[in-house]
Amino acid sequence: MLCTVIDIRGDYAFVKYQDTGVVSEVAIALLPFGIDVGDKLKFENYEFERV
């Protein structure tokens, strides 16, 4: 499932899933190091990977 980081607030990032349009709050610790607003991610097997 593909998503985009739309905002970062403190220890949390807000990601918007492309297929559903749902916005979710995700702990920064679960995301790849150096993540920034606008980055595209793939969520698969309960892990996020930068694409």
Model-inferred region functions:
Residues 11-15:
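Short aromatic-glycine-enriched beta-strand elements
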